[in-house]
């Protein structure tokens, strides 16, 4: 056992010396590796031939293995270290290359390639012309639609800006400077106010005449069919009269409140000019309505 331990220490020291020598002389390492490989092959062949003997004892085999294993153990680490050094030198010399990228071919290129391979016919020409015509028609229709939309938007803008343009011009032409002759302007304002009151009175009289005519016709119809009327019909008529009276009173209250609050200074809510025509429903009476 002591002999084997001493033998291993010698092997390790020889391996360190060989590695230092290999680092200093890399060219000699290559030749040493080749020699060690040839020696290992020859030793293996000798062992195989010696192992075929019949009168060989197990103790002799162990001693022979120990004696034969010493050169192999001496040479095997040298060969491994020399191969490692050669690999490291080769790896230092090699430069890292970028990874190749394979681009995918587009379907259009494949179609073009197939079309080039195929023979060209008159039908293909007709088909190409037809597709060109269809594309041209589509582009023309699209351009026409865009122009039409532009015209409609332009008309809408013009109509929005031109509403009540005449009324705006008349309002701008009015002389609202009261500092020149304040008394005269005040007198004109009273005249306009009286005209508005008379106009409102005429409208109310027309409504009153219409309601009186309706009541007169209703009274005549009641007198004609008085015998056929029942108690239930009379009650309905009375309730209807009460409702009409309530409606009339509520309308009078609204008119009074409107007359009282008509000329109060309030904050403007709608800046846009409305249609103040006589036939319109949203007709409002103001001091400029007489114009």
Curated annotation (Swiss-Prot):
Show the ranges annotated as biased composition (Polar residues).
28-41, 52-62
Principal subcellular localisation of the protein: nucleus
Q: Where is the composition biased (Acidic residues)?
A: 63-91
Q: Which key words tag this protein in UniProt?
A: mRNA processing, mRNA splicing, Nucleus, Ribonucleoprotein, RNA-binding, Spliceosome
The answer to whether the entry has keyword DNA-binding is no
Q: Which Gene Ontology BP annotations are present?
A: generation of catalytic spliceosome for first transesterification step; mRNA splicing, via spliceosome
Function per UniProt: Component of the spliceosome and rRNA processing machinery. In association with the spliceosomal U4/U6.U5 tri-snRNP particle, required for splicing of pre-mRNA.
Q: What is this protein called?
A: Pre-mRNA-splicing factor SPP381
Origin species, per record, is Saccharomyces cerevisiae (strain ATCC 204508 / S288c)
Question: What taxonomic lineage is listed for the species of origin?
Answer: Eukaryota, Fungi, Dikarya, Ascomycota, Saccharomycotina
